[in-house]
Amino acid sequence: MGKGGEDCGNKQTNSSELVKSDTFPAWGKDVSECEEKFGVSREKGLSTDEVLKRHQIYGLNELEKPEGTSIFKLILEQFNDTLVRILLAAAVISFVLAFFDGDEGGEMGITAFVEPLVIFLILIVNAIVGIWQETNAEKALEALKEIQSQQATVMRDGTKVSSLPAKELVPGDIVELRVGDKVPADMRVVALISSTLRVEQGSLTGESEAVSKTTKHVDENADIQGKKCMVFAGTTVVNGNCICLVTDTGMNTEIGRVHSQIQEAAQHEEDTPLKKKLNEFGEVLTMIIGLICALVWLINVKYFLSWEYVDGWPRNFKFSFEKCTYYFEIAVALAVAAIPEGLPAVITTCLALGTRKMAQKNALVRKLPSVETLGCTTVICSDKTGTLTTNQMAVSKLVAMGSRIGTLRSFNVEGTSFDPRDGKIEDWPTGRMDANLQMIAKIAAICNDANVEKSDQQFVSRGMPTEAALKVLVEKMGFPEGLNEASSDGNVLRCCRLWSELEQRIATLEFDRDRKSMGVMVDSSSGKKLLLVKGAVENVLERSTHIQLLDGSTRELDQYSRDLILQSLHDMSLSALRCLGFAYSDVPSDFATYDGSEDHPAHQQLLNPSNYSSIESNLVFVGFVGLRDPPRKEVRQAIADCRTAGIRVMVITGDNKSTAEAICREIGVFEADEDISSRSLTGKEFMDVKDQKNHLRQTGGLLFSRAEPKHKQEIVRLLKEDGEVVAMTGDGVNDAPALKLADIGVAMGISGTEVAKEASDLVLADDNFSTIVAAVGEGRSIYNNMKAFIRYMISSNIGEVASIFLTAALGIPEGMIPVQLLWVNLVTDGPPATALGFNPPDKDIMKKPPRRSDDSLITAWILFRYMVIGLYVGVATVGVFIIWYTHNSFMGIDLSQDGHSLVSYSQLAHWGQCSSWEGFKVSPFTAGSQTFSFDSNPCDYFQQGKIKASTLSLSVLVAIEMFNSLNALSEDGSLVTMPPWVNPWLLLAMAVSFGLHFVILYVPFLAQVFGIVPLSLNEWLLVLAVSLPVILIDEVLKFVGRCTSGYRYSPRTPSAKQKEE
């Protein structure tokens, strides 16, 4: 299994002397030092006894499963919310009071228990949803485990053990890796079995291509991309076989560190800006409710506690428990009125509707609160590969030889995908390809192991993306006889297949790092055997002695032509193009009769890769191509849109600096001629910057290349500390910690790993950066609509509080009972509030800077407006209650048809003294099909008899809130300029809410539950007459608001943050 094992063949280092690779950098030591440190021989591997000892020290090679939160703790966490705690307290108190409901309480039987039961139901549903979301949070860690290898081929006790469970590996184990294997642990490459080894580790490091590995040690301070002699757990071998030494297992591997970082990031997840505002609102509401409830109760102390003064001292105290309980119930009703119970449900509904809108734009929301957070995004940290670019290598330039020596021809190649029909070659000689171009096409098609297939309407590569791009180029070049329709549904690579039929491949000289080229021998249809070579331009050119001209003739490669080719190569490299050169020659004389048979004498030369350089000599150079991972077509405009919207774009990539800079210039992150020396840093360079926050505050775009997971996390952490709202994109395992830490984690739906998706808040179905920008615009629109219905619901609650407070202050019977207020808050207000989520977005929504994350939901002016509206609601609901008791008519509307008795306002305000009134009598009155008579106890007229007045109050409240929802269409815009039909859903919602109110009014059973009765036509006219003025009042307030907006708001300048500091 390789050489060099004799030095340490019988050595076994004491297990306790082993150290983690953090202190022993295996990548910085040669192979013999590593074997000695881990006490192992490549030929024998570890002994069984030594494996057992190391198992005790290092444990199993698997990722830790964090202790899950107990279901009891999860339930308790759901009540760690101010609004929820207020609701819980109100429910408990209401439940207790239901048992002690006195004669003056008025609520009997089932009605008394409806309120607490409904509140408990709300809390239970809220808790279930919360627990479900919490249990989904650990899926990122579970997905991470799926990446781990399940089995490994290991040398133990001198015997090769196939299919050993990978979890049983320990540091020091000798493992054999073959093509297609998933790497089971972090390992040092100690010997190559094949001539070359390539590993796909982009999901861990962010590199766009498979990386060649070597046995040679590297600098001890190398970053993860620079550790060319290491292979990492979870990555995949795509080419070659090798022998490795396990250096780290389990949580000590790179993927284990990612696991730890995800756990750490999950512990630091913050509430969304809206949740913070609602929590603050809840805390303020708690204090206000407490004060008002206490005030209401104290105002009415005189009704249940009295005393006489004797000799200047209070004596003969009289206390009525029933009345005390009754007024305490009024205080509880006030609490119920003040709490917007329906708000959580409406917010969830609006966010859910927002997810549907975003899904139509290919943005799949995984976590509902992220919909709102998107709207205040100030910085987008984007990965390059696959997000800004297509992650599909494409040829962008083709350089061929000219008609005479010392001349070159250059062709620009369009297209950004593996679709052969995507773009064309500019100025291409269709149907009349010269001999030089034919040779380039032949080499690109045959010296190639990749394939392109059509899957689900998309073209995907099988094999190396670079080679797939070459085959796509061949299809765009067409065929000499004029066959240019390269692709069809059943035959994607027609031209490549035709070349393969004409030139039968008989041998392959595999790529290796030393000669940096690949060659194939072909048996041509012309009867000649040729060697076709592709590889690094400098290396292929160095082994070339001739060049092929346009007409197919060859000339000796002189220094001028060599310099011309190298200069063109240099110019293309400045554009971050990866260049591949093409050459050919007649096969060496030893292979003149070779047909691929293993019995041929020349076949032995092919078994030794050291012979390949001599075989690939005396070549004829024919041309070269420049390839790249091209930027997506929509990205440049999307980045310009971000700039207009006040959102900064930072590119954070694991790719090399020059490639990333070229892409950033092309897509508009940087200007073409801009000095970016202070804006483009590697991850390591950024970590060495003294004032990192100041660096991140630079206006315009920033680039961080060769970035490791820790660099991404640090950038996100610093931005969040500086008050930015950060959206982070990523697709790899290495991105997961930063995705979890960011305010908005955005994963790629097509190329993204399951780990990245599970750690994210948003998944892009099309992997397209421009989709993020569209989602941000949608998020802003949703937030504006949420702000509209939150303000609407809060203003409604202010009105209810004002109504109850006025009732208590005036001393009249309570106009509305808690169950009625609960119905209004949960059901009646729900449809209009939800419909406000359908308000059309502002046309200039992406031309405004992002709102501040601490932007107030309710400004002082808005609060004043709703206090005015709330006061009117209180006056209207209490006023209609008083009108029914004290007037036969109002505004010409006859109210005497039901035959109820009139009382004076003084009697109504002192109804508690009714029993002391001499000769007080009331007439029976009708409500619907019921007749109410109070002959036995006339004082019941102010309790059971208030049912009609209470119905009027409730109906006025419902009607005002419906009309007030029209006011909420726009913060300052008049209904004249923004009429109700701009949102037809709102008109439908108003009809639904009125319909629901009619149901509880006119269905006898429900009317009994809610303590109301049907209203006559005249009574409905009274309701409308009292309710409609709310529109006029708010129109006046909006007009004042428009006139004074310049005084109340000032624009936020770009330097605002610096001034604040």
Swiss-Prot record:
**UniProt binding sites for Ca(2+) 1:** 797, 800, 828-829, 961
- Entry's transmembrane regions: 71-91, 116-135, 279-298, 328-345, 787-806, 817-837, 858-880, 951-970, 984-1002, 1018-1038
* Recorded topology in the membrane: Multi-pass membrane protein
Keywords linked to the UniProt accession:
ATP-binding, Calcium, Calcium transport, Ion transport, Magnesium, Membrane, Metal-binding, Nucleotide-binding, Translocase, Transmembrane, Transmembrane helix, Transport
Task: List residues binding Ca(2+) 2.
Answer: 336-337, 339, 341, 825, 829
Q: What is its EC number?
A: 7.2.2.10
The UniProt entry, under InterPro entries, shows:
ATPase_P-typ_cation-transptr_C, ATPase_P-typ_cation-transptr_N, ATPase_P-typ_cyto_dom_N, ATPase_P-typ_P_site, ATPase_P-typ_TM_dom_sf, ATPase_P-typ_transduc_dom_A_sf, HAD-like_sf, HAD_sf
Extract the ranges annotated as region (Disordered).
1-21
Designated name of the protein: Calcium-transporting ATPase 4, endoplasmic reticulum-type
Q: Which organism is it from?
A: Arabidopsis thaliana (Mouse-ear cress)
Lineage here is: Eukaryota, Viridiplantae, Streptophyta, Embryophyta, Tracheophyta
